[in-house]
Amino acid sequence: MKPLTVRQREILDCIRRSVENEGFPPTIAEIARAIGVSSPHGVREQLRALERKGVIELIPSASRGIRLLARAEEPGLPLIGKVAAGRPLLTEAQVERYCQLGPELFEHKGDYLLRVQGMSMRDAGIIDGDLLVVQQAQEARSGQIVVVRLHDEVTVKRLRLEGALAYLEPANPEFSVIAVDPERQPLCIEGIVVGVIRTRVG
């Protein structure tokens, strides 16, 4: 099977969740709402692509005419390496490859992997070259390690919320805390770090 695109994986995950939670697949309109697109035409095109790749079967003239096939195994988590300034994280251009990870490895499910650049989170056990397992989220609790976009740059820091301010704290005394007033500058949380994979030792 050819690797799924980010959008196709998102749609496949949406179908799986509906089948697992509701007992039946979603409609095209429900998929469009779930992935944040306004046009059902684009969803239909992606569903046809998923059918060609052998992961679903489309049943004509049925509002919920989608059937998951046995080959619809997890394509793996997208691995994002160097992040281009100003670009959304989960675009096909940002994905290096897909990696298979057993769901039992981490307490919380990850949505993508992010390659660490730099040593600002060293004392939290995160070093240059590590792969972070990240769960997509737009909100986070104080104390969680988050992936955030600030000034079109993506960084990994521990979030501390205090009053109206948000502080992005490194885990290395050689780096400075970043104070953010969300009313003056946008702070976009991209996800919460739920695991770390060390890619080399020594």
Curated annotation (Swiss-Prot):
Site (Cleavage): A85, G86
GO biological process terms, semicolon-separated: DNA repair; DNA replication; negative regulation of DNA-templated transcription; proteolysis; SOS response
Keywords (A to Z) from UniProt: Autocatalytic cleavage, DNA damage, DNA repair, DNA replication, DNA-binding, Hydrolase, Repressor, SOS response, Transcription, Transcription regulation
Highest taxon in the source lineage: Bacteria
Catalytic reactions on record: Hydrolysis of Ala-|-Gly bond in repressor LexA
Record's signal peptide: none
DNA-binding positions: 28-48
Membrane-spanning residues: none
Enzyme class: hydrolase
Catalytic center residues: S120, K157
An example Gene Ontology molecular-function term: serine-type endopeptidase activity
EC number: 3.4.21.88
Record note on quaternary structure: Homodimer.
Record function comment: Represses a number of genes involved in the response to DNA damage (SOS response), including recA and lexA. In the presence of single-stranded DNA, RecA interacts with LexA causing an autocatalytic cleavage which disrupts the DNA-binding part of LexA, leading to derepression of the SOS regulon and eventually DNA repair.
Family: Belongs to the peptidase S24 family.
Protein name in the entry: LexA repressor
Highest classification ranks of the organism: Bacteria, Pseudomonadati, Pseudomonadota, Gammaproteobacteria, Methylococcales
Gene that specifies this protein: lexA
